[in-house]
């Protein structure tokens, strides 16, 4: 007879931390230069006028203005641009 109870081991019990991806500032909203518009993996959204692309594909505003989402070209690329307020 075993003196200790056999303890099973599970191969589950791990999870990764949340990455908080997605659109942070929506179309028509005001934004300041340097603020993040979209956090993404890969370029689901492409940068347009007044928008920069970070090393991790984050889109951020280069100028103060209003955010504008559009689709362009035959590939229907979703572009984000910041229209400077006059």
Swiss-Prot record:
GO terms for molecular function: structural constituent of ribosome. Coiled coil: none annotated. GO terms for biological process: translation. Keywords: Ribonucleoprotein, Ribosomal protein. InterPro entries: Ribosomal_bL27, Ribosomal_bL27_CS. One of its GO terms (cellular component) is cytosolic large ribosomal subunit. Transmembrane segments: none annotated. The keyword DNA-binding does not apply. It holds the Pfam family Ribosomal_L27. SUPFAM superfamilies: Ribosomal L27 protein-like. HAMAP family: Ribosomal_bL27. Belongs to the bacterial ribosomal protein bL27 family. This is Large ribosomal subunit protein bL27. It comes from Xanthomonas campestris pv. campestris (strain ATCC 33913 / DSM 3586 / NCPPB 528 / LMG 568 / P 25). The lineage of its organism: Bacteria, Pseudomonadati, Pseudomonadota, Gammaproteobacteria, Lysobacterales.
């Amino acid at each position: 007879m075993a003196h200790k109870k056999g303890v099973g081991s599970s191969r589950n019990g791990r999870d990764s931390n949340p990455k908080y991806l997605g659109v942070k500032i929506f179309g028509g909203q005001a934004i300041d230069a340097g603020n993040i518009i979209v956090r993404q993996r890969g370029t689901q959204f492409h940068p347009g006028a007044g928008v920069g692309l970070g090393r991790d594909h984050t889109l951020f505003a280069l100028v103060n203005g209003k955010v504008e989402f559009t689709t362009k070209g035959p590939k229907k690329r979703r572009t984000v641009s910041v229209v400077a307020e006059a």
